[in-house]
Amino acid sequence: MKVRASVKKICRNCKIVKREGVVRVLCSDPKHKQRQG
């Protein structure tokens, strides 16, 4: 899980999801998981 100021889709499988006010990127590739912080 990378914590970044700006989260971006890295590949076409990445999805941007907002959970409890936190923006996250979910992907089939675990290296692409991010959250905004």
Swiss-Prot record:
Keyword annotations for this protein, in alphabetical order, are: Ribonucleoprotein, Ribosomal protein
Q: Name the domain of life.
A: Bacteria
Transmembrane as UniProt keyword: no
UniProt-recorded Gene Ontology molecular function terms: structural constituent of ribosome
**GO terms for biological process, alphabetical:** translation
Provide the leader sequence positions.
none
Q: Kindly give the InterPro entries that the UniProt entry links to this protein.
A: Ribosomal_bL36 (IPR000473), Ribosomal_bL36_sp (IPR035977)
| UniProt KW Flavoprotein keyword | no
In the UniProt record, which is one GO cellular component term? ribosome
Q: Which PROSITE patterns match?
A: RIBOSOMAL_L36
The similarity annotation says: Belongs to the bacterial ribosomal protein bL36 family.
Task: Report the protein name in the record.
Answer: Large ribosomal subunit protein bL36
Whose protein is this, by species? Mannheimia succiniciproducens (strain KCTC 0769BP / MBEL55E)
